[in-house]
Amino acid sequence: MNIYDVIKKPLITEKTTVEKDDKNVIAFVVNGAANKIEIKAAVEKLFNAQVSAVNTVNVAGKTKRTAKGIGKRSNWKKAYVTLKEGSNVDFFEA
């Protein structure tokens, strides 16, 4: 899989911002077919950062009610990437 297809976007929430500051962990929305090895390679290549661990979570899409009946949002995959000491990804800085 191409490294540009692995990572879709960074996941920026209150929880991920606290984890970035405390534990040097960043979160991404990734392709559902990507595995931990591909995610690690993509982060190291795209952001020039040293990765120590990757944890993934498959998030189930929510069921939503609409005027036409019941629909479902897509399932998606989230990756928590732990960076080694001294490594930093600067897209969180304003």
UniProtKB/Swiss-Prot annotation:
It comes from the Bacteria. One of its GO terms (biological process) is translation. Keywords: Ribonucleoprotein, Ribosomal protein, RNA-binding, rRNA-binding. One of its GO terms (molecular function) is rRNA binding. GO terms for cellular component: ribonucleoprotein complex; ribosome. One of the early assembly proteins it binds 23S rRNA. One of the proteins that surrounds the polypeptide exit tunnel on the outside of the ribosome. Forms the main docking site for trigger factor binding to the ribosome. Belongs to the universal ribosomal protein uL23 family. Part of the 50S ribosomal subunit. Contacts protein L29, and trigger factor when it is bound to the ribosome. NCBIfam families: PRK05738.1-3 (NF004359), PRK05738.2-4 (NF004363), PRK05738.3-2 (NF004366). This is Large ribosomal subunit protein uL23. The lineage of its organism: Bacteria, Pseudomonadati, Thermodesulfobacteriota, Desulfuromonadia, Geobacterales.
